[in-house]
Amino acid sequence: DKAKDKMWWSTPENVGHDKTATNTIVEDLSSSLKMVYGEPDARSTTNMRSRGDAKIKVKDKSSGVKITYSFKKAGITVPVTYTLEDDYLEAKIDTADIEEEDTSQSGKLVTSLSVLSSFGAASSADTGYFVIPDGSGALIRFNNGKKTAKSYTGYVYGSDVTAVAQTEPAVTEQVYLPMYGIVNGDNAMMVVCTEGDSNAKLTASVSGQSKSSFNICGFDFTVRDSDTYYMSGDNSTALTVFEDGDMKTDTLAVRYYPLETEDTPDYTDVAEAYRNYLTEEAGVTDTAEDTDPGLYLNFYGGTIKEKSV
């Protein structure tokens, strides 16, 4: 961000020196692309990370690069286009370009993808918060000490109502907006999922809770659903089945907007940036009309309540 002389990192700075993170977590945080694939025959899923699991090929493009991640073990190749525009960075995946060697019952198929999930991660020394569109909005403050609490998860526009829940969900409000914000000291960023948002899940965790010293927030995309069930009353062995057919969304895209503010930024600047995105780029128009009502009407109600004395 040249306007504020701020360096935003796609993966946490000095993550390899984090003494609280295991090698697996370090690889997780260091990966610009994470993937989960399913094996129908084995009824199981496997996590893959670009750091350690993929070979990378880079090709220059207009205003950006196209990086192809080849996961040889899974036989899956995922191209991601990173584009730098005047006021944002965009990461985009066209699912039609994803190559899967074998999606049959005996093969491997992509079930979820996460790109730049550690972008803008805050360290244990940083001061700030994530702006989460949970209901009317909520703040998750960095390093708040809630290490044993469950990490935040919110499905954009709600979870799949046809899926049978395996556990009691956390008490949260509905995520109505495909965005979140990062406010870190004198700098801020608004992040919006512009495509594939109906299949997006927003996750956030603070230091300790993330099994590292970093505070992290980002989107995960479900491209094929899966379900788990148990046979013959045996609760010790879970069987997983996967959605058939092609991936359910054509494009996945996330934009990162660094904010320019005259004063120290806060969550109102994040909200303003998202409003500007809606009106200037997403085609949302103001339908409210200024009118002078001829009548103001207030309703009052009451009830009789019996009480022991």
Question: Positions of the model-derived regions?
Answer:
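Carbohydrate-recognition beta-sandwich/jelly-roll modules
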Residues: 1-309
